[in-house]
Each structure stands twice: as C-alpha cells, then as structure tokens.
C-alpha cells in the first residue's frame, strides 16, 4: 500500500482542495481523514462524486455519515438502510450522542447520581450535542437536571457561573466542552469548594488540562475516551510499547485512533474484490469484528462502529482507573 500525505492545515476549503487532488490526480482508492467533523464533512461531496471512500478516526459529529430529519431521527427504507446515508463516508470513532448518553448512564449507574448540573459549550455543535444527549438520557432514567449553564469558546472567567451553583443541591457536574475552558471551570469550581464528581467527554483528553486546572483540582474527575493507556489488553500494550520506541512519547487517543484507522482501511483494501473506490467501499461496509487498539467493532448500517468506550477517572491529574462502558 502506498501512502500519499497532505496537510489540510485544519481548514475546510484546503481539505476540499486536497481531497479533490487525491481522488482525481493521485489515483487513490481511499482517503484517511480529515480528523475533525467540519473538515471531514467538507470532503464528503468530493468522495460521493468520485466514488472514493473517506474514513475518519475522530470526526464525532452525529451527522457525519448520515443526515437526520427535522425530528432529529434517521429514516430507513424497507430494507433497513438509511435513506440519507452518505455512501462513501465512514468513521471508526463513536459519535457525540453516544458519549453524552454513556456519561449519563455512568453518572446514574456507577456514581448513583440523581441530580446533575450541565455547563455546556454553547458555541460548538460538539458541546450542544453532548449536552442534549446527556440531559435526555439522564432525565429518562429518572434523574433531575438542577441547572443548565452555558459558556462560549475562549471564555476565561467562570466565577459567576460557579458562584451561582454553590447554593444548589446536586450530585455531579457534566461539562461537555474542550479542555481549554474545562480546565478553568474545574479550577474555579474546586477553588469555591465544589468537590462533587465532574464528568466530561473526549474533549478533556489533553496534557494541558493539568496545566490549566492544577493537579490538586483534578480529583473525582471522570471522562469518556476512545482508549486508555491503563488497559492490559495485549493489543493496547504492544501498541504503546511500539509507539514509545518510535516517538519517545506516550500515545494519546488520537494516536490510537489514527493507527486503527490505517489498519481498518488497509484491511478493507486487502478484502476488496478489486482496487477501486467502489470495491473498497463495499469492503469497509462489510467490516465485522475488527480488532484495534481502541476496541473491537463492526461497521453498522450508518457506517458507524458498534463499539464500547472507556470512562477514565483522574486522581491528582493522573489516570487512576478505566471502565469499559457499552450501551448494549
């Protein structure tokens, strides 16, 4: 397999241009990436037009592989196939709704929480989608949302929001957002005496979180992720050892997802009837029981992986435990 690499500079228009070049000039039979939801969605029309599959390791937006109707649901035909499926788009990561739902169940089932506060990033689809799924699942399970607060990306002062919460009665705080703001929110909450469990999603996963919040504040923290370095699974441990030997660094979830993505696509190329985009697409659709660093999965009818996630706990800023959570 020959690899052709380009840098989309985290820009949607650049991703579109490079995807076009890969498919029309370079003659590829599959494209890996882009990593983010917005950039990945930008290349899907190119994939559909040229009948070349694109697969992402980390685009978690719910509507990446299929469009939803006005009720927020996927419509199916009489054969059980989504009517608005993006035929040439695939991913190997779970989506935002899955994370929100899983963390709501974890709060109720593992932490015995019945009352929750949500502090969401209202400036991103990521934050809004996670918040919606968490609230729906938590309340459907009999829980109460005591308060829903919001912020926008780049905010730095959260004292007013946290002060408002100090007079309320709740068991957990769920913060669907990215580490840049999350670290400051946690730091402020702990400084004002709020010591309850604080929950989040894969946006927590960054070494910068400890720099922003401080190790002392990062206790009783739980967030879901695609994998944990605490795993004793031989597939995971061998990957970590090989990564450290090659790069002299600890691999994060994005490294693990990138590795699995390459293996996933190469596996499909090896199973394809011929080396064409259409044949590789069919092989990707027929993937069953693929074993990767981020877990084993089968591709479903919406081109999403059916897999579990890992809930990681932090104590003094370090990973203390990892719990596999499935929605089965």
Per-segment meaning from a language model:
Residues 28-147, 197-222:
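Extracytoplasmic ligand/sensor domains, especially the bilobed periplasmic-binding protein
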Residues 245-255, 266-319:
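Segments of small-molecule ligand-sensing domains
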Residues 9-29, 105-109, 156-169:
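Short, well-structured alpha-helical segments in soluble
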Residues 9, 121-123, 227:
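Residue-level signal for short, function-critical loop segments
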Residues 1-10:
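Short helix-loop-beta-strand segments that form the rim/entrance of peptidase-like active sites
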Residues 1-2, 33-34, 115-121, 148, ...:
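Surface-exposed patches in mature extracellular/periplasmic domains of secreted proteins
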Residues 61, 186-259, 315, 319-326:
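Extracellular/periplasmic periplasmic-binding protein-like sensory domains
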Residues 37-48, 156-163, 168-192:
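Hydrophobic alpha-helical
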């Amino acid at each position: 397999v020959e690899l052709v690499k380009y840098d989309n500079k985290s820009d949607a228009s650049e991703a579109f241009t490079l995807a076009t070049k890969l498919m029309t000039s370079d003659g590829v039979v599959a494209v890996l990436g882009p990593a983010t939801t917005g950039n990945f969605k930008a290349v899907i029309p190119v994939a559909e037009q040229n009948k070349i599959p694109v697969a992402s390791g980390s685009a978690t937006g719910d509507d990446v592989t299929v469009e939803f109707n006005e009720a927020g649901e996927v419509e199916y035909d009489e054969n059980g196939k989504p009517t608005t499926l993006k035929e040439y788009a695939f991913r190997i990561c779970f989506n935002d709704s899955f994370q929100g739902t899983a963390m709501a169940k974890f709060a109720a089932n593992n932490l015995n929480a019945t009352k929750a506060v949500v502090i969401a990033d209202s400036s991103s689809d990521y934050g809004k989608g996670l918040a919606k799924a968490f609230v729906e699942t938590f309340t459907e399970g009999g829980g109460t949302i005591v308060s829903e607060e919001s912020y926008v990306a780049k905010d730095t002062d959260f004292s007013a929001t946290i002060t408002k919460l100090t007079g309320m009665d709740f068991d957990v705080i769920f913060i669907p957002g990215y580490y840049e703001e999350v670290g400051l929110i946690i730091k402020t909450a702990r400084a004002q005496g709020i010591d309850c469990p604080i929950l989040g999603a894969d946006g927590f996963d960054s070494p910068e979180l400890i720099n922003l919040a401080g190790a002392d504040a990062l206790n009783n923290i739980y967030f879901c992720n695609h994998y944990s370095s605490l795993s004793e699974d031989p597939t995971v441990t061998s990957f970590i050892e090989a990564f450290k030997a090659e790069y002299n660094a600890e691999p994060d979830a994005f490294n693990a997802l990138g590795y699995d993505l390459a293996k996933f696509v190469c596996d499909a190329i090896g199973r394809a009837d011929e080396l064409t985009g259409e044949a590789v697409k069919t092989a990707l659709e027929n993937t069953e029981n693929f074993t990767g660093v981020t877990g084993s999965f089968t591709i479903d009818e919406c081109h999403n992986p059916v897999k579990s996630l890992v809930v990681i706990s932090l104590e003094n800023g370090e990973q203390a435990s990892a719990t596999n959570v499935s929605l089965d």
